[in-house]
């Protein structure tokens, strides 16, 4: 079983979406369940509504899940497992302040002050309401983790240390909650960012101390870099999926690009369902990959070009295949929904009759309003020229502005078939 485990602490990052896609693909390939676990145990950082946004984004990409739950729903289970470790002598109560463990010469290591707190002392702490945490006793041996990309990694017992598993407010730490939930859900394949590699030894140790013996396959993906070769962060436009949507990039293109990053694909243009047929998680590059917005623009253009005409028209508020075909006439100069939408809006918006060609435009507007519908542009153009007496650029330029709202663009003979039934609205 595989899982995607985001935290509702901000907008979904582009890198997180890539991880979700890979987990979903591998789950489909293995014909096992794929679950979404909202890791909301850090109450102070949670942002209301972000969990819903995450699920809505997954839905836009047709990433379906077999179940979804919030980690906070398992609070009682986490507490019970922590108490069990305490009772088995595998964990201990600690009353040290956050600063106390840092008082020795190795601030990142726990100093062992509370190793020998007994049951009587624990009873006193509860009665006197003295805050305490529960720590897992550090391992006796180094932890060895096997990763698809990093190979064998060794984490010393000192690095794992005696870490906190239950906070003073009785909520679990992220490492403890994640390990417990992975164990309870039977997660045996974990695909996530290499930023979590250092946490893996602790999470494996938790499962081991709880008696869980099932093997877990790990694939810690390299981070995504910006075009300057630095790790992407909030300063980078493409850091969040929300920004990509706002800029007019569509799910098919985004998924196509994220799957292609650091990968050799059999074809440049593909959909998520198609990728499931050939994707190989072991073939991804183990090195960081750069995000190139121009490459995404190219893919977005290609996917818009392939999109069903009527569906494309719906992105601009229509339900007419002709409007989709009209939009595709602009595909060479527009790569996003926003850019295409601007062209369509220019065609259907009221025109400016106060500009250079205003007088001629008013003349043509009146003729069009009184003219019959012509099947071809040639017949339409001939009628307008005859009735207006205009010719040359005094005819062609005002006609183009009247019909498209712009002085340049595709041939009017190509545009006309798709707007002829809207002429009274367009030419006004």
Curated annotation (Swiss-Prot):
Biological processes per GO annotation: glutamyl-tRNA aminoacylation
Motif 'HIGH' region: positions: 6-16
Keyword terms: Aminoacyl-tRNA synthetase, ATP-binding, Cytoplasm, Ligase, Nucleotide-binding, Protein biosynthesis
EC number: 6.1.1.17
Keyword Metal-binding: no
Catalytic activity line of the entry: tRNA(Glu) + L-glutamate + ATP = L-glutamyl-tRNA(Glu) + AMP + diphosphate
Example of a GO MF term: ATP binding
InterPro entries xref list: aa-tRNA-synth_I_codon-bd_sub2, aa_tRNA-synth_I_cd-bd_sf, Glu-tRNA-ligase_bac/mito, Glu/Gln-tRNA-synth, Glu/Gln-tRNA-synth_Ib_cat-dom, GluQ/Sye, Rossmann-like_a/b/a_fold
Localization per record: Cytoplasm
A GO cellular-component term linked to this record: cytosol
Keyword Ligase: yes
Superkingdom to which the source organism belongs: Bacteria
Pfam family, one: tRNA-synt_1c
Function: Catalyzes the attachment of glutamate to tRNA(Glu) in a two-step reaction: glutamate is first activated by ATP to form Glu-AMP and then transferred to the acceptor end of tRNA(Glu).
Family (UniProt): Belongs to the class-I aminoacyl-tRNA synthetase family. Glutamate--tRNA ligase type 1 subfamily.
Quaternary structure note: Monomer.
Protein name, as recorded: Glutamate--tRNA ligase 2
Naturally occurring in which organism (per UniProt): Sulfurovum sp. (strain NBC37-1)
Gene behind this protein: gltX2
């Amino acid at each position: 079983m595989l899982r995607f485990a985001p935290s509702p602490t901000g907008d979904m990052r582009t890198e997180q979406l890539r991880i979700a896609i890979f987990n979903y693909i591998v789950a489909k390939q293995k014909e096992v369940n794929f679950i979404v676990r909202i890791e909301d145990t850090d109450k102070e950082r949670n942002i209301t509504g972000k969990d819903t946004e995450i699920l809505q984004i997954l839905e836009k990409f047709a990433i379906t899940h077999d179940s979804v739950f919030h980690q906070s729903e398992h609070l009682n289970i986490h507490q019970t497992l922590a108490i069990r470790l305490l009772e088995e002598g595998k964990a201990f109560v600690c009353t040290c302040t956050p600063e106390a463990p840092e008082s020795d010469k190795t601030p990142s290591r726990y100093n062992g002050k509370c190793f020998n707190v007994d049951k009587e002392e624990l009873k006193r702490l509860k009665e006197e309401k003295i805050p305490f945490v529960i720590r897992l006793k550090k391992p006796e041996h180094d932890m060895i983790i096997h990763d698809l990309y990093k190979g064998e990694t060794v984490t010393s017992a000192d690095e794992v240390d005696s870490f906190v598993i239950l906070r003073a407010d009785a909520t679990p730490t992220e490492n403890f909650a994640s390990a417990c939930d992975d164990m309870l859900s039977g997660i045996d394949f974990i695909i996530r960012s290499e930023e979590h590699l250092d946490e893996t030894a602790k999470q494996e140790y938790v499962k081991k101390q709880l008696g869980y013996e099932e093997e877990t396959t790990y694939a810690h993906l390299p981070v995504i870099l910006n075009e300057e070769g630095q790790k992407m962060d909030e300063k980078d436009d493409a850091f969040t999926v929300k920004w990509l949507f706002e800029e007019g990039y569509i799910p098919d293109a985004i998924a196509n690009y994220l799957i292609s990053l650091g990968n050799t694909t059999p074809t440049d243009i593909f959909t998520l369902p198609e990728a499931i047929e050939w994707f190989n998680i072991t073939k991804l590059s183990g090195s960081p990959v750069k995000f190139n917005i121009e490459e995404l623009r190219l893919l977005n253009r290609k996917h818009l070009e392939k999109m069903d005409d009527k569906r494309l028209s719906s992105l601009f508020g229509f339900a007419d295949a002709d409007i989709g075909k009209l939009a595709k006439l602009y595909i060479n100069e527009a790569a996003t929904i926003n850019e295409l939408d601007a062209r369509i809006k220019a065609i259907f918006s009221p025109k400016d009759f106060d500009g250079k060609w205003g007088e001629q435009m008013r003349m043509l507007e009146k003729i069009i309003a009184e003219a019959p519908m012509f099947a071809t542009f040639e017949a339409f153009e001939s009628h307008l020229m005859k009735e207006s007496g205009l010719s040359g650029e005094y005819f062609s330029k005002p006609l183009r502005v009247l019909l498209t709202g712009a002085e340049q663009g595709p041939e009017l003979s190509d545009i006309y078939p798709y707007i002829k039934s809207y002429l009274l609205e367009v030419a006004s």
